[in-house]
Amino acid sequence: DWKTLNIRLTSRDNKQLYREIKGWLGAPYLYGGNTKKGVDCSGFVLQIYKTVYHKRIERNSAKIFEKNCKMIDVDDLREGDLVFYKTSKKTSRITHVGIYLKDNKFAHASSSKGVRISDITEDYFIRHFYAAGRVVK
């Protein structure tokens, strides 16, 4: 049942992506983790990309942006694209990544709430947004 995701799916949506994300919802945050017992943001994205898209990507959010993505306009975001954030005052590097779904929703491993779905238009995510990217390699 997709209602738990609060996203209205159509026949054009990648059901495997949503099924996989649904299985991760609520997994606790663990820095350096990449399993449902504990996962960080890049570990979550890496696992989804491996399972759903059969692609190997970098293990660090800044490196994913640098080595695996081409930058796209936020208005061109499509299901499976990535959204990147700079959430730390201590560094100017990208520190967070999530997977765009649709209707401004994205899935990510939040350090405070674990794997969840958030809205890119929430104040926090607008303030810390860095770029949108499409995985090309």
Sequence positions of predicted segments:
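Solvent-exposed polar/charged
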Residues: 23, 50-51, 99
